Swiss-Prot record:
GO terms for biological process: rRNA base methylation. This is 12S rRNA N(4)-cytidine methyltransferase METTL15. NCBIfam families: 16S rRNA (cytosine(1402)-N(4))-methyltransferase RsmH. It is found in: Mitochondrion matrix. N4-methylcytidine (m4C) methyltransferase responsible for the methylation of position C839 in mitochondrial 12S rRNA. Involved in the stabilization of 12S rRNA folding, therefore facilitating the assembly of the mitochondrial small ribosomal subunits. It catalyses: cytidine(839) in 12S rRNA + S-adenosyl-L-methionine = N(4)-methylcytidine(839) in 12S rRNA + S-adenosyl-L-homocysteine + H(+). HAMAP family: 16SrRNA_methyltr_H. The gene is METTL15. Belongs to the methyltransferase superfamily. RsmH family. Pfam families: Methyltransf_5. It comes from Pongo abelii (Sumatran orangutan).
Amino acid sequence: MIRYPYFCRMYKECLSCWLESGIPNLGVWPKTIHTTAEKYREYEAREQTDQTQAQELHRSQDRDFETMAKLHIPVMVDEVLHCLSPQKGQIFLDMTFGSGGHTKAILQKESDIVLYALDRDPTAYALAEHLSELYPKQIRAMLGQFSQAETLLMKAGVQPGTFDGVLMDLGCSSMQLDTPERGFSLRKDGPLDMRMDGGRYPDMPTAADVVNAFDQQALASILRTYGEEKHAKKIASAIVQARSIYPITRTQQLASIVAGAFPPSAIYARKDLLQRSTHIATKTFQAVRIFVNNELNELYMGLKTAQKFLRPGGRLVALSFHSLEDRIIKRFLLGISMTERFNLSVRQQVMKTSQLGSDHENTEEVSKRRAPLMWELIHKKVLSPQDQDVQDNPRARSAKLRAAIKL
């Protein structure tokens, strides 16, 4: 069992880095965190064991695969296929295989391709392995995080500049949300876990560790930064008060604590994009999940890997489901530094850079603020799902698609 005071001290450096900078944790995780370089030294030793366990899992669950795959409906399939434009003989990388919905659609569009299917979730990897048995010449299953992708690809003999297209479908999959034991959903009671690959890294902190260990200020910062929660201080205070009585270990327990900080009329007062009522704890769950899985830092490293392994003229398609992800993708494609304040819009940043250049100020400063463009946008504006997409899959309502061609 984790000793919470020690856990809190261990994360002190991590919190101070991004709290002082005012931006999400992009490249600032300290050496003490489990998911960084120190922990990755164990990766080589674990890799074979992980893959063997996943293979055993998929052999023992063959009958369940079709059901599992149906849990996740791929989003904006037509738009993804249009932007990737798969052609005979091309090579692709799906960096978020999930249940394989997009991969299958690509294969249906053009079967004479090779597709590397990556996912950090061992359950998704097992599905990819199963699909590779059906398409042995096309599918290459890979288990790992975005930050491990470069190593995995190089070990598989894939050289930089190889891929004709890379797909990223970010966020939490329906398979994860609909499995109470994973602890992602506030609507289904389960252990407060939220780790996408906790089975591979048992020492990786869970959502329960986060809400029980961090002080009130740190919790509020997590909720405000990763959940864009305007009531972050109030919710953090409620969490700290509740855990002083008993540890917070279940998803619906946390949801009830958050709800208890507000009058009953406010619990479902918020509306989603479909004007449906959403629980007041939704943003809290999002924030904790993003923090636990280091999702924004992983996204940035995934984008860099995609750029490195795409050939000139290769296409990147990225689907995001909240504004923080979309902002990172947009800035990356426009060559704007991730160290700039996130409350400064891309338009403001471009204007600011132009003003610096026109005044003949420090050219090095200008180049730091905006790197040379490496991408040509396929669509100038972000794409949103069609009404039919949202009707078929309400979870697609917040999807945003950005696509670009590597120059």
